[in-house]
Amino acid sequence: MTKKIVFLDVDGTLCDDAGNVPESARQAITAAHKKGHGFFLCTGRSKAEITEDVLALPLSGMIGAGGGYCEVHDEVILHKVFEKEALLRLIDFLKANQIEYYLESNQGLFASTNLRNRLIEIVLAGEPVESETGKQRVQTIQWFLDLLIEDEAKIDYDDVNKVSFINHSIPYEQVHDQYHEQFQMIRSTVPVFGKDSGEIGIKNIHKKTAIDFLLNHLGIDNKDTLAFGDGHNDVEMFEAVATGIAMGNACEQLLAVADEVTARPEDGGIAQALQKHGLV
């Protein structure tokens, strides 16, 4: 059969809510890879956020930072970064409005002063941190907390792919109105962060632009492509491929444009769809 290229969103798609790759997905992807099909991550995460659990999969490459970074077989073919002065002005705005944030680069994730405490507060949702339930909730994000670098002296402001912000201070619309003409704005890509949170990326850079670039680099027609996703930032990804497959937990916006809907990650959604399309 014709070899396919498959693009995989990570959070809520390849990984379940706890950030783990279900065994059903791991086995199906491995089996499909052995048949010659190619798998690429296509995620809002920057490279520094990709866990070993995900990297252990047989991947041909990745699109990261919401389309700002792309590599094929360890070769970097695309890397977009913020203009330094514009980034510094953005950081000043976030600080002035008491908005916590982290700067995403391939060198690491650089956190604002109170981000760690804010994330723990959000995930606890009123539960005492010393309680058993509280400890379990914090444990679900411990992998992410461990990635955070809290030392401004280590930041290379010339190598930032994206900015994610956790905001409960001002309406999202205020951030959007201030910056949507200058940057690519995406609202609430991580629902637990709250509806006024979001991501800020390079203008006119998203998953579709990166997929188009990658396919052109490989000389592959998009008629042989599939993509799996669950969130708002996967809408453009579905526009770039022949078949867009929404997970059972996908947002309404993505369900409206999906070609198919499969089960949730933990219920074998990826494996079921790969089997349906004859890749395994």
Predicted segments — roles?
Residues 1-5, 9, 21-22, 197-280:
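Mg2+-dependent phosphoryl-transfer enzymes with acidic/Ser/Thr/Gly-rich catalytic loops
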Residues 18-129:
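Active-site phosphate-binding/coordination module
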Residues 32, 94, 178-179, 254:
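A generic structural signal for well-ordered alpha-helical segments
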Residues 36-40, 59-60, 160-162, 223-224, ...:
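Short active-site oxyanion
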Residues 57-58, 66, 179-182, 240-241, ...:
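Short, structured coil segments at secondary-structure junctions
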Residues 59-66, 184-188, 246-248, 262-264:
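Short hydrophobic/aromatic-enriched beta-strand-loop microsegments
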Residues 108-226:
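Conserved acidic, metal-coordinating active-site core of Asp-based
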